[in-house]
Amino acid sequence: NWRNISVSTSLNNNDDNVMFINTGNIEVTLPPDVPGHTIYFKRMSGGVRLTGGRILPAPGGQEMSYIDLDFASGFIKCMGNYWVMFYCG
């Protein structure tokens, strides 16, 4: 499922590819834990803060309640009870 997002919202368990096209700052809530689920993303302009659940900024990182995305493409994967962030350069 592909989704363009321009306002604050919640992601769904069927969101697989997300492009953030907002111009201002938005807050996006992750779906409930679904082990193995991966959400690919691309941030185009405005600020994006991911919230909800237990978030790790990288494998082995310290748990956070939110993470601010940079402009790189990446993905966030549900691994057990955590959403783990990976960037693709």
Regions found by a protein language model. Give the residues of each.
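Exposed extracellular interaction/assembly regions and N-terminal maturation sites
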Residues: N1-R54, M79-G89
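Short, surface-exposed, polar/charged, turn-prone segments marking secondary-structure boundaries
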Residues: G46-V48, Y66-D70
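Terminal beta-strand-rich extracellular "head" domains
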Residues: I55-D68
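Extracellular disulfide-bonded cysteine-rich modules/repeats
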Residues: D70-G80
